[in-house]
Amino acid sequence: MYRPEIKRKKSGAPVLSRKEIDVIGQNIVGDFMPEALKSPQEIDIDLLAQDYLGMDQDFQYLSHCGVYLGMTVFNDTDKVPVYDPQNNCADYISAKAHTVIIDKMLLEENQEHRYRFTMGHEAGHEFLHKEYFAYDPDQITLFDLMGETPAPMVQCRVDTKKMDCRTSKSWTDRDWMEWQANALSSAVLMPVSMVRMVAENFKRPGLHQIFCHYALAEEVASVFNVSFEAAGYRLKQLGYIPQEAQLSTDILNMISFDLACNY
């Protein structure tokens, strides 16, 4: 399996730029699914997590209100917090290390894109952050001397996709790792070289520029089976759509209807 050299803080948290994460994502895809770097296509994120990274997959309700979408378990534990809808109460279950738990809400209709991004996010935690969270029970550490143990898991909230590096001065290691997991999910689901191939081969002659932005984001979303929002963000990040451009799914629906009538 591909193993990049990653600079880390003393805590074990990685220090990575967006460009470095793009390289890591591209190399993961190249090692796992080489054909996906020859022609743009959907990445099988379930197969990557389970077969390539060796993660076990589980589905639970992680909260009563959908605030948590996914969870990565790094150490064996019998204290995984879940929600029991039948009894309307919190509960605990057991899970082994290297388990990814996805909220059952994401198995519902029209949730495929959120599911795929969340699986990519949790796979990102597994690939990048084991050194920070993992605990060797055969070694005595400072945690043992203090009567504590490291957190056995990381819970991922629904709002982390909105994290912006421009506010990063006050970020903790955990904040940075959420951002890194988001960035790696994007880099794996939409490998940089393949997004560039789609964008540079995309042509809609006679179409107004703002409509071109919408059409390009819709094309990327379709090719890689990701959300329109994720595709637009990726294209902005790579410079194909201006950062200040506002992309609305409501306007997309109107434009898509108009394009269907004219092409």
Please report, for each region that a protein language model flagged, where it lies by residue.
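Active-site hotspot residues in diverse enzymes, especially metal/ion-binding acidic/histidine motifs
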Residues: 1-263
